[in-house]
């Protein structure tokens, strides 16, 4: 990571007030970047005129598009909002990039769930088939197709448009409903057993800063030279763990009798297994995950127990792990 690259760099972040967006904005601010954020409730990526005007006024050199409806269960409840936000919102971000000459690199954040998951245990690589059984996963696959179409049709040289696909990101500050870590924390704080669905499913758990580190490396490289159009950022294979493992680890770190139990209610389908191959990012960007699953859980639980005071401390501790 080139810290000097980010000093005084003009960066436009959609979804800057969300879970990953808050961490990214804080990190870039610490690096000296001039960050402009665009988020709900006042700023909606489904409003093209508003987004284009905001981006034009900011004159960013780098855009990182994070804004999304990011929950699988919510996508079953409101598929229309999921598709309009994740697909049309992405198209609007790309249209705004087209209309903003200052942009040199556009990082479009999708998801590891953009791949057609047939239940096989093999990790997904960037060239695997896209697809999605649930509305959320399908919307991210559709967003990937839109990104590729804009890259080939309208933005073949500059700005360079890259899609980035991370695993299941955990860390402090995620308060989403129907997401594992926030649900655990809410139950632990209330002194109640957390209700967990599908405890035997396997996911590529990774700390939020590991994923964001990949995004900023992709932006740095895309700013300077041509790179492939998509990158996976997933943890080491050994850190693809079950939901049961993560719930047990969070409860143990939390202490105080924290516990969970498997929900007996019926739930919408979720893939049994998910993992990523990140060879391309390792070879071309020099990216590698710095925190193993155990450390990621410890940092996450500690943040929720000590709240926001740990955000800057954990960013600084993570940066100390980076090569000089």
Regions found by a protein language model. Name each.
Residues 14, 60-66, 108, 232:
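Rossmann-fold scaffold of SDR-type NAD(P)-dependent oxidoreductases
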Residues 33-40:
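Conserved glycine-rich Rossmann-like NAD(P)H-binding loop of the short-chain dehydrogenase/reductase
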Residues 11-27:
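N-terminal Rossmann NAD(P)H-binding glycine-rich loop of SDR-like oxidoreductase domains
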Residues 77-95, 99, 104-105, 114-169, ...:
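Catalytic helix-loop patch of NAD(P)-dependent Rossmann-fold dehydrogenases
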Residues 31, 188-324:
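C-terminal substrate-binding subdomain of Rossmann-fold SDR/epimerase-dehydratase oxidoreductases
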Residues 1-9:
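A short, basic/flexible loop-to-alpha-helix module at the beginning of a structural domain
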Residues 45-85:
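NAD(P)H-binding glycine-rich loop region in Rossmannoid oxidoreductase-like domains
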